[in-house]
Curated annotation (Swiss-Prot):
Catalytic residues as annotated in Swiss-Prot or TrEMBL: C150
GO molecular function, one term: lipoyl(octanoyl) transferase activity
Name of this protein: Octanoyltransferase LipM
Organism in which the protein naturally occurs: Bacillus velezensis (strain DSM 23117 / BGSC 10A6 / LMG 26770 / FZB42) (Bacillus amyloliquefaciens subsp. plantarum)
Catalytic activity: octanoyl-[ACP] + L-lysyl-[protein] = N(6)-octanoyl-L-lysyl-[protein] + holo-[ACP] + H(+)
Length: 278
């Protein structure tokens, strides 16, 4: 069977506002049939705390710590919880809901898209699997997360290695298009991460941080030898091609497309109105 060709964009390290604006722009262009489906890789400059669309930042985020660590801050167009984007490869997938390979339900679409990430981990010699809830109680706990921290628990069809979460993803559907983006951790600074949230007491923070060590892990804590960012890019690009049975064709934005993204970044994702609205 002939492989479908998707676009591949590696946009490098960009500002938090630019990163979210480009994901939204790709979703919009795909909905207009201007571009085929897209896989995008990116990084962050500066390292950034992103929060989910629905998160209440006044109750959950410690902005003194965000500033102390020199981090950027942005609200995502997707749901989910707080993510520290630091030593990671971030990816996004943009594809129509009516694509013949895309299931109708959110969780099943997660599984299909995440096949690419699963293969990427395997390309790095890590035995990754999907975390599928086994009981009704586990299903319920996924619907009602107790923590503000995204990597605190594997959610439905998240990827785990040795029982610990290795990639966190969030999804939105707009204009008939699926946008899934997520983090693939190479390394993690747990103290910095846990500084960024508010807790009822120090004891609660200590307990959550202790539990976190048992639930989440970065690639370089597991890999037989250190994985560089370039090696991760190669492994996961090949992983998406294998997992989704596609061919990825590199693409560079035109000057007009870039201008559109920069304007969206400035007017929406860099604005206090968007970032601090709840």
């Amino acid at each position: 069977m002939e492989k479908e060709t998707w676009r591949f964009i590696d946009s490098g390290n960009e500002s938090p506002a630019f990163n979210m604006a480009l994901d939204e722009a790709l979703l919009y262009w795909h909905s207009q049939k201007k571009i085929p489906p897209v896989i995008r890789f990116y990084g962050w400059n500066p390292a950034t705390l992103s929060v989910g669309y629905f998160q209440n930042i006044k109750k959950e985020i410690n902005f003194d710590a965000v500033h102390k660590h020199g981090l950027g801050f942005v609200r995502r167009p997707t749901g989910g919880r707080g993510v520290l984007h630091d030593k990671e490869l971030t990816y996004s997938v943009i594809v129509s809901e009516d694509h013949p390979e895309m299931p109708a339900t959110v969780t099943e679409a997660y599984r299909v898209i995440s096949e690419g990430i699963l293969q990427g981990f395997r390309n790095l010699g890590l035995d990754a699997n999907f975390a599928i809830p086994r009981t009704e109680k586990e299903k319920e706990s996924l619907k009602n997360p107790r923590s503000s921290v995204c990597f605190d628990a594997p959610s439905w069809y998240e990827l785990v290695v040795e029982g610990r979460k290795v990639a966190g993803s969030a999804q939105t559907r707009q204009k008939g298009v699926i946008l899934q983006h997520g983090s693939i951790l190479l390394d993690i600074d747990e103290d910095k991460l846990f500084d960024l949230f508010l807790y009822p007491s120090d004891r609660v923070r200590e307990r959550m941080q202790r539990n976190f060590k048992n639930k989440a892990v970065a690639i370089n804590a597991l890999a037989p030898k250190r994985v560089t960012m370039d090696e991760a890019r190669i492994a996961f690009k090949a992983g998406f091609e294998e997992g989704l049975n596609i061919h990825l064709e590199p693409y560079t934005l035109t000057s007009e497309e870039l201008a559109f993204v920069n304007e969206l970044a400035e007017t929406k994702y860099a604005s206090d109105e968007w970032n601090y609205k709840r």
